[in-house]
Amino acid sequence: MSNIEQTLSIIKPDAVERSLDNEIKEMFKNKGFNIVKDKKIQIAKSEAEQFYKVHETKPFYNDLCAYLSSGPIVVMVLEKENAVLGNRELMGATKPEDAAEGTIRKKYGISIDKNSVHGSDSVENAKIEIDFFFKD
């Protein structure tokens, strides 16, 4: 029995600013992901605060929210078997210098903050995050 899942991926401002969104989308497609929905948007800091609410008590929370709302982002719903784990593997470690060769963050990430992509960390959070950006 297949385990087709959906997950949310965000191409963050640093990557969009460098016009890497199409290259990153190709990386997903080459790994068998179907991009079900995608849109380029700019969110307000208050929306970023709501999105990252789970990190509210962490010291990096304000910087994270300011960064996500600092420029256009591309939000996508990705679908494939075991999509959540597959996306996490393709993104690579949070710190680009710790990420494995061939991962998005190793290839395009600048720093722990400007690491080019976000991905849902669980099936449950994927549902919540997809609903956050695609309420239809």
Regions found by a protein language model. Give the residues of each.
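Non-catalytic terminal and connector segments of soluble metabolic enzymes
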Residues: 1-136
